[in-house]
Amino acid sequence: KLIQMKENDEGTTFVFLDETNGQIIGYCTYCASGLKKAYENDSITYPAAEIKYFAIDKTYQHKSYDDDFKFSDLMLCEVLKKLIEISEEAISFDYILLYSVPEAVNFYKRNGFCEFTEFMKKDSYNYIDGCIPMFFTL
């Protein structure tokens, strides 16, 4: 179950609850952003959403939901559905961005994200040092 908790300067945060026991499974914070693409001597920024934080309790990280999906896949799918809904109903954007820790890159690739191409410019925030910039195209 996805529950909206709060909105602040970081973005909007949602918490995932296990409905069988009320335990918090994980959380996600997303916000408005932009994807910068370089073109010769110029760059263009395209509207995007950014998943700033996506964390899952260790007991659920590799736990299967059923034979086909893991809890982590279903939770990310819920976030993507919510962002697609926002794009269609409120703020139009074509990309969802995130900065992945190296050990989670395969998880995001399995769920449709790609690493930035050579023409995409990453942000220079300190908290993303060592993280891999990735994008999902709507």
Whereabouts are the PLM-identified features?
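Non-catalytic substrate-recognition and accessory regions of acyl/acetyltransferase enzymes
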Residues: K1-D66, L74, E78-I96, V101-L138
